[in-house]
Amino acid sequence: MNASQFRGAFTIFNAMHHTEENPWKITSEKNIYDNPWINVTEYQVINPSGNPGIYGKVHFKNMAIGVLPLDDELNTYLVGQFRFPLNQYSWEMPEGGGPQGIDPLESAKRELLEETGLKAAQWTEIQQIHLSNSVSDEWGIIYLARELTQFEPEPEDTEQLIIKKLPFAEAYRMVCNGQITDSMTVAAILKVQLLISENQL
């Protein structure tokens, strides 16, 4: 065994004997910022290497909800809007915040109707996702909505939305060529593409 093979074997050995126990120790914490949607906490910690440091965490007070609508002809709907934190336009599936303590499916139904005017008779949870787990505890649920009926959209007054109906295959191409970068939408479209390729839809 040469040196490179030995290092590879050592890495695999370490991974096999790795435990999932929390190696971080919190020595103190301080609330830095709070509003109705997020809270920012700064922690004084002992990190996994045993050294002191700080860690900032953004806590989201609502869960993230995403809905990928898919009709009988395998068309889907994207929502276009300008995203303030990115300072750029974004194409996404219908998304929003689901208050804690409320059935996330009810939040998903509300978001779909508000943003697209669609109601769905068939709902399937297809993915759960942590959106930025190095700095935030934000957690999301993604639903696939089928058997669609069109009504009037009911957008919030802070939203300026463009709704685009397109073949799902085109939405998949938009993910592949980088036109769609929203993480929940990327995850949803790739998951549905996998389900289609495995004849599960």
Which stretches of residues belong to each language-model region?
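Positively charged N-terminal leader segments that act as targeting/secretion signals
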Residues: 1-12
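Nudix hydrolase/Nudix homology domain
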Residues: 13-24, 89, 100, 125, ...
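Conserved Nudix-box catalytic region and its N-terminal flanking loop in Nudix hydrolases
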Residues: 21-23, 58, 66-110, 157
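Acidic, metal-coordinating catalytic segment for phosphate/diphosphate chemistry
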Residues: 29-66, 72
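Short, solvent-exposed loop/turn elements at beta->coil junctions and helix N-caps
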Residues: 29-32, 127-132
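Active-site-adjacent beta-strand/loop module that shapes the phosphate/pyrophosphate-binding cleft
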Residues: 41-49, 132-151
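Short aromatic/basic micro-patch
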Residues: 92, 142, 165
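A short coil-to-beta-strand element that immediately follows conserved catalytic motifs
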Residues: 119-126
